[in-house]
């Protein structure tokens, strides 16, 4: 199975036989990102069932390195999200850590020391494309953060639509202290989320911030008692899962594509997304359920 990379583009293109993933990314085979063998299970998928069917947990589990992402863990991430992309029943994705006290410590710097500049270039590009893949999923993504989310770990959380953290969470992009910069989307996504000035301060200084400051700056959506981020993320995923799945996809598309352009163009995107929902069975089901004062049963059609 081959992984994919994204190239920036103004117009939307459709991947043959698959739904478009995002506003201005196109999929292209990337030879440098071929998954050659089954990697160790550093990333484990958990598909919830029953009334929670459609919610998928992506569990990070590399305790020896505090979930630092080496080549093998990156392959595990690629496998996991390729599987989610292929799953038509997926409605909400949540990324969490199974390692107590840490979300993700970033890249594996011990492995990095053994790499040539060319190998580092390939690895960082692969990580950047991986996080762009997460961002470009048509369904909502939630990061449930306990403990440290540093470097590439924070960049992974930034690629998600929503972030929920425990009070014990710590955030930072310390790369300038290593004479490099955040290379997996941090300079771009952080700036778009918290603003240019705050982003520059955090990246220039490499300063770590706690959960309360992160919430005040808008870096996270919700801060809860330590140890309760997963529970809160499940609650939010359940709320999303109850809504019309096509509507959720179109809402994400309208917001993500519209925010990158001017108001007039953004309203055109909104109109296009709304139009796509008018002839769906789910829209009729929503109206019928409202009239009959019952819970709607959405099928994604």
UniProtKB/Swiss-Prot annotation:
Domain of life: Eukaryota
Annotated EC: 4.2.1.17
Protein's cellular compartments: Mitochondrion
GO process terms (BP): branched-chain amino acid catabolic process; fatty acid beta-oxidation; proteolysis
Catalytic activity from the UniProt record: a (3S)-3-hydroxyacyl-CoA = a (2E)-enoyl-CoA + H2O; a 4-saturated-(3S)-3-hydroxyacyl-CoA = a (3E)-enoyl-CoA + H2O
UniProt entry tagged with the keyword Lipid metabolism: yes
Transit peptide endpoints, chain numbering: 1-32
EC category: lyase
Function summary: Straight-chain enoyl-CoA thioesters from C4 up to at least C16 are processed, although with decreasing catalytic rate.
Family listed: Belongs to the enoyl-CoA hydratase/isomerase family.
Name of the protein described by the UniProt record: Probable enoyl-CoA hydratase 2, mitochondrial
Species annotation: Arabidopsis thaliana
Lineage: Eukaryota, Viridiplantae, Streptophyta, Embryophyta, Tracheophyta
